[in-house]
Amino acid sequence: MSAQQQCDLTSYDAMYYLQTGDLQLAVNLFISPNSSFSYSGNSGQSILQSLGTIIIWVYKVNGQIHIYTIGWQPIYYSLQNGCRANIYFRLWALIQIQGAWLASEIMNMPVTLKNTGGQFVGTFIPLHLLGFAIADFPSLSSGSQGYTHMLMSQTDGSIKLLPSAPGVLPYFITVGFQCRAGAYVLKQPCPNCIFVRLCVPTSNGIPYEVLMLICLLIYAGCYASYSDILGKNGLSTVGAGVNAKVPVTAIVYFDTQQYIQQNVVSQLNVTIQLYALIWVGISTTNFVILPEISQILKMPSGLILNIPVPFQAYPTPTVAIPRILTLITCCGTPYIYNQYFPCSFDKASTVTTECGVPLVAYPTISQMQPIAGSNVAFLLSNQSADFADLLSLNYGLLNLTTQQKVSLANQYSYTMTQCKKEVIRGTYYEECVKNVSSNLNQYSSQPASPQPNIPVDEILIGVGAVALIVIGTVALVLTGGASAPVSAGLDVAGAEALGSLLLDNGALSLSSLQEEGLANTLMQTSVSDSFESEDEEIVQNEPNSAKLVVFTNTNQPFTLTVTGTDITGTVTIQSGIADFDLTITLPSGVSVPISVPAGVIDDFTDDQGYTIYEQEDQPVRLKYSDGQVIYNTISQLGKKLDGFFSLLKKLLKYIAVALLSAIASILVNMFLFMPLVASIMTSIIQSGQGVSSGGTVTVTGQSTSTTLSTALSDIASTFGQIPQILEEIPVALASAYLITDLLTDFFGDLWRGFSKNLLPNKAVNVNIPQPLEVDLKSRLKAYSEAVISKNDKGEWVINKKLRGRFS
């Protein structure tokens, strides 16, 4: 047996090391004896740095800046023999909770790096692609006070995260592991699920957040023999090494989107769906996948966060099987490159997935073909094409030239280094990730959506504004009458939260927004939110509200002809009925017809006798009464909305999810509201024509007649104020997602603050012909807090305040 073969036969090495209740991992580096790799001095330190911490977030706590990290945290390394080095790492595990963010060292993940004759194969996790969250606790201390020493082995065999120092929030997780003879084995408390208990502190009030999503990747280490694993899975044990002990790696992906319970105030009990992604790492020539994965691999691609992602084969001559799994989850992108078997349970024959499929492996045979010519030393220093090969595979970038791969690796290393510098300067990590993605996407055969240089903040504000307008429209249809109390004012924070949600997850692209002219029509400003009285009537023509403009017709029929560069058509009124027939040309050149047939919808008649012309498939709202066409909304909208929120509060637990879905659906239908409004008003100003058929135009509050162009200028001047009052609007939808139990109170307050500045004087709603889809269950970059107190009526209420955003 050659020296090279001896170095490759390392299947007996453990990945996990149990030390004083703390799980640590060893990365086994397989180096050929003739490599130039050095284990001492600066070279060893360089390796630790190359696999070291990645800074992702800056968080201000009590006036102090804390830099939180996620990534491999190198502890120390040791030379085990002439061809193998063990480097010990810690990893910050990730748990994402809507409204509360926890990143704790609850589990350390093993990575196996193997050099088979010079070719790198193994398990590699690109950490910056993992879904990440940040802990909302005072600090991450070190030594005995740190989270490193909070992993305790319980008497029931489970692993819990327990606090060991005052001031650290008492989050702890029960993950369903069983300690058996020194080996941790995944167990199932119930046949088709895993139970996770999340106990949250109550010192600052009832935790109102409903747990919407946990993305948790767990790598569990245990020992088993070749023959035991192969035999239980119906495979031949011939040549398997008989009783050889091998490391086992279990990869489990949890998804709680459809399994949510909220129990007592101090505890959230969540039953988690267990996906059958369970593997055992064995260095043999067999590759085994589970039934569900077999079905996934048959698909050419899948939707990940609304983005088509191909399931591709592993393009290397070292593995000859048709497909090696490229597993992509919403938590990140773990790539499985090595040979694996499904994990051995205590009762493997009786364990099934959530679909009732037994966890029995289906074998596929492959053969390792060693290739000489490289070593892991260069790979770890990020200087050779080996690292570039790995990196390109991690990003799903295939068929790259050697030069492109090396350039890819250089771009990656450079941008990640810049991230650390920018965080120190105060720039957020998200910008760095965008830089990394931008540099890497240039090599992809299927590049991501282009990111043009346009004012993103303004776009996000506009998108959020439309969301609130839509919510009000839906509310108006559903209710009227009663009044709801005001429990909290608005707080300016996280204006881009909603837009970031849409853009980050591919629901909207900046290029599509730019095509419709949205980027050129919005401004970012701030407004006052001092409107607090629940009974105060909205005063017409007050500051910050649009003026009521009345077109008085003295002859029948009365026809308003509009001829401009962007909008053309007519508005005809006869016998008390108005017909609207307009065409709007967008900046992209697309023409949108707007034709509101004659007729009256009585459900939209206010107490002043005005009616609103509005149909679901028509994008313009107007109203007409007694010979007057009024380009406004009704003045009692706020009062009717109070009734809606009062009613909805009683029914919230039953309709919250449905309401959010409706908001998401309607939101995208309406997201081009602002550019079309701007186009309409600009065109009317530019093309102001006199009133035909002898009509005259008067403006309410003025004693003399004026021309149509002057009246339209008044409209446009007040309409121009709309973009200036939208900064707080996106906070509404972001908070609705985070605070389901308090949804109605928050939106009630938000609507009052909004209506103070805009209502009741006009509304123009525009639908786009083909609405996009939005996934509101994706992450939001905002968080919130609740404080419980008694009001003057002796009732317990929760005051809400959106505190900010992370990026």
From Swiss-Prot:
Keywords: Host membrane, Membrane, Transmembrane, Transmembrane helix
UniProt keyword Membrane present: yes
Main location: host cell
GO cellular component: host cell membrane; membrane
Membrane topology: Multi-pass membrane protein
Signal peptide span: none
Subcellular location as annotated: Host membrane
Ranges annotated as spanning the membrane: 210-230, 234-254, 270-290, 459-479, 657-677
UniProt-recorded name of the protein: Putative transmembrane protein ORF807
Species in which this protein is naturally found: Acidianus filamentous virus 1 (isolate United States/Yellowstone) (AFV-1)
